[in-house]
């Protein structure tokens, strides 16, 4: 059940809150939370505004990496010849390793493996692991630039995902906790604006560096840019999320904490039976939290719509420049897609957060914005790919992207506010896992398979874009049946799943 955020805020003079559940944290997570809260008070800390800026820059660099590897300058193409015998040289990663479109799509999705595995771990354990994760990211990106075989670059991309997971599950809950009440959606919009902006910047960056130097230099440059933030991850004070004080006072786990000369030591019983018991409690606690999330109907429907949405956006971000180059013979596809995406991404994402704040940020209003913006965006994007005129395509596609990107703040607002504060990091982690494992992880290889089969980028993009209508339909169901989600009729969730399954089945035969 959704609780009002005001009801979840603990009184100033109290140490506990009636909305925080200690059962939602596992013993191992509690232990690390205690460690985080016991850091010496003199350790350096940053204001929420500065942390928002840092998170935005890190997010920007993460998605710039995705845009760079998708750019024609870095991704490249295989050697091809036309009917007249005129051949084009092999370029970029695809040309260097002679990859098919399917293998190229696998390269796009491989980093998600690390992200999916590591996100719940980072969400449950140490708040200080941001520094470790960003260090892994930096080393992995260096490895991408130094790759000597296809399997090696795929492995490095997996570790890039591990690095990204270090902050992605913690950043949004922290921003929501610390943003002014009337600007929560706007702050989230600013953070998620970095997703399309980063991808667009990656298109331009990768296209320029790949063309003038080598695709390898694009990765090495990213590592240099991220290195200072990896160091900062070790130096800044650990994040403290809502519910931390409750854990501090009520869940010591019989740990004796001592602070001597600015050093923190934890003494715990090390017997095998105690360790096994702690691990067992960790897994049972995690299972209980997952059961709570699964029963939260708003969360389930929101994520189902987000999965469909991300399936399209993930494939757009990777195949967009190549599709545009082949359909409209764009000479500067990286620059054009980059410019359109960065402008529409910034304006659309910020507008979505601003509009949600203006109409009052609530879950019903968020669902209205999600379904309406996604449907109209799908109409414009679908129509754009039917046009033969390059300028007509750019105009309509820009309008479509503007509307589609307006969903970033609302969809994450729902993820954060449909559960109690203590479950927000896990909610964001599971949402991230779901939208990737069912969304953009399979979409890039599947689009590659479709393109290899029908050999028409226009038809491929039209098939892909049509899935946005499914996302709009799911979010619309969430809006019109919101009251039913909070009723005791458990069969309603089954009805929703059957509707989505039938819709997907019918779509497969349309």
Swiss-Prot record:
Keywords: Glycoprotein, Lipid transport, Membrane, Mitochondrion, Mitochondrion inner membrane, Transmembrane, Transmembrane helix, Transport. Gene3D superfamilies: MFS general substrate transporter like domains. Glycans are attached at residues 75, 98. One of its GO terms (molecular function) is transmembrane transporter activity. It comes from the Eukaryota. It is a multi-pass membrane protein. It is found in: Mitochondrion inner membrane. CDD domains: MFS_spinster_like (cd17328). The keyword Mitochondrion applies. GO terms for biological process: lipid transport. GO terms for cellular component: mitochondrial inner membrane. InterPro entries: MFS (IPR011701), MFS_dom (IPR020846), MFS_spinster-like (IPR044770), MFS_trans_sf (IPR036259). Pfam families: MFS_1 (PF07690). PROSITE patterns: MFS. The chain crosses the membrane at residues 44-64, 106-126, 136-156, 158-178, 185-205, 219-239, 298-318, 336-356, 369-387, 392-414, 430-450, 462-482. Probable sphingolipid transporter. Belongs to the major facilitator superfamily. Spinster (TC 2.A.1.49) family. This is Probable sphingolipid transporter spinster homolog 3. It comes from Arabidopsis thaliana (Mouse-ear cress). The lineage of its organism: Eukaryota, Viridiplantae, Streptophyta, Embryophyta, Tracheophyta.
């Amino acid at each position: 059940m959704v609780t009002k955020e005001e009801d979840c805020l603990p009184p100033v003079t109290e140490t506990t809150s009636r909305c925080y559940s200690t059962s939602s944290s596992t013993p191992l997570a509690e232990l690390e939370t205690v460690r985080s809260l016991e850091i010496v008070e003199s350790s350096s800390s940053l204001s929420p505004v500065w942390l928002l800026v840092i998170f935005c820059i890190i997010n920007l660099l993460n998605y710039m990496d995705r845009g760079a590897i998708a750019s024609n300058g870095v991704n490249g193409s295989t050697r091809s010849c036309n009917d007249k015998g005129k051949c084009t040289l092999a370029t970029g990663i695809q040309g260097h390793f002679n990859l098919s479109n399917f293998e190229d799509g696998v390269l796009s999705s491989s980093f998600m493996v690390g992200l999916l595995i590591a996100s719940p771990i980072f969400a449950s354990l140490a708040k200080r692991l941001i520094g470790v994760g960003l260090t892994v990211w930096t080393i992995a990106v260096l490895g991408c630039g130094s790759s000597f075989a296809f399997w090696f670059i795929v492995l490095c991309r997996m570790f890039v995902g591990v690095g990204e997971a270090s902050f992605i599950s913690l950043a949004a809950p922290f921003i929501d906790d610390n943003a002014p009440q009337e600007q929560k959606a706007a702050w989230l919009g600013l953070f998620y604006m970095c997703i399309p902006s980063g991808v667009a910047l990656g298109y331009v960056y990768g296209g320029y560096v790949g063309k003038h130097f080598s695709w390898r230099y694009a990765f090495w440059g990213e590592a240099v840019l991220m290195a200072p933030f990896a160091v900062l991850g070790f130096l800044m004070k650990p994040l403290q999320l809502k519910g931390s004080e409750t854990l501090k006072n009520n869940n010591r786990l019989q740990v004796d904490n001592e602070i001597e000369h600015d050093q923190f030591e934890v003494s715990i019983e090390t017997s095998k039976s105690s360790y096994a018991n702690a691990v067992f409690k960790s897994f049972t606690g995690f299972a209980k939290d997952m059961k709570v999330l699964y029963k939260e109907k708003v969360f389930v429907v929101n994520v189902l719509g987000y999965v469909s949405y991300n399936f399209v956006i993930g494939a757009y971000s990777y195949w967009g420049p190549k599709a545009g180059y082949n359909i409209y013979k764009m000479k500067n596809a990286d620059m054009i897609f980059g410019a359109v995406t960065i402008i529409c991404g910034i304006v659309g994402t910020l507008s979505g957060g601003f509009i949600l704040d203006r109409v009052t940020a609530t879950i019903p209003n968020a669902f209205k914005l999600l379904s309406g913006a996604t449907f109209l965006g799908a109409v414009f994007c679908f129509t754009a790919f039917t046009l033969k005129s390059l300028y007509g395509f750019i105009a309509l596609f820009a309008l479509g992207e503007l509307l589609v990107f307006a969903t970033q703040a609302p969809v994450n607002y729902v993820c954060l506010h449909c559960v109690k504060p203590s479950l927000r990091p896990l909610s964001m982690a599971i949402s991230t896992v779901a939208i990737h494992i069912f969304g953009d992880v399979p979409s890039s290889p599947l689009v590659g398979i479709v393109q290899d089969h029908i050999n028409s980028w226009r038809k491929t993009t039209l098939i892909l874009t049509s899935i946005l209508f499914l996302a709009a339909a799911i979010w619309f169901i969430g809006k019109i049946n919101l009251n039913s989600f909070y009723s005791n009729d458990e069969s309603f969730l089954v009805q929703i799943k059957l509707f989505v399954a039938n819709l997907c089945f019918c779509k497969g035969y349309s």
